[in-house]
Amino acid sequence: MNQDEYNSKFEVNDKESKLLKDAFNQVSDIRKFEIELYWKRAAYFWALIAVAFAGYFSILASEHMPSKFFLSLIVSCIGFVFTFAWFLSSRGSKYWQENWENHLDLLENNVTGPLYKTLLERPGHINMAEKLITGPLSVSVSKINQWVSVFIVFAWCLFNN
């Protein structure tokens, strides 16, 4: 669908359009829902991965466990699968969140004005400590999670050696 078709289907250029306002509200709610689901999924995977780590290290710490190395291999493979699933889930969640944010960008002008497109920042940092440590920083929390999951995937791979 091109921009003109989109604008026509959602009556983007009509400030009084009920369809436009309803679409904007629904898209806004879906975006919030996607973000909520992202964190629920992340917490779910964190719990599974933490259990896998605990199981892995408790197996290795056991002195008299038969098939100790085989069991640790099985648990580390399970941990790898959960971690890789977390990575893919994070990427998929980010995809859908950005989809709804793009809809908001297209719909918002005649509903709220360019609210989602407008970025307000502090005029400056007070000192170097605030700039480097305590001040705000434009980073993606979901990308941090993705990098952490990649690191943990490599950790599971190392545990298998």
Annotate each predicted stretch with a short phrase:
Residues L48, A52, I74-V81, V148-L158:
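Lipid-exposed faces of alpha-helical membrane segments in multi-pass integral membrane proteins
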Residues W46-K68, G113-T134:
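Charge-rich, acidic-biased intrinsically disordered regions
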Residues G55-S62, V81-R91, L158-N161:
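Structural signature of transmembrane alpha-helix termini at the membrane-water interface
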Residues N2-S62, W86:
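Cytosol/matrix-facing amphipathic helices and coiled-coil assembly/linker segments
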Residues I35, H64-L71, T134-I144:
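Membrane-interfacial loop-to-transmembrane-helix junctions in polytopic alpha-helical membrane proteins
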Residues L20-V27, H103-V139:
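Short membrane-interface loop/juxtamembrane segments of multi-pass integral membrane proteins
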Residues P123-N161:
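A hydrophobic membrane-anchoring alpha-helix module
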Residues P66-P123:
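Inner-leaflet juxtamembrane helices
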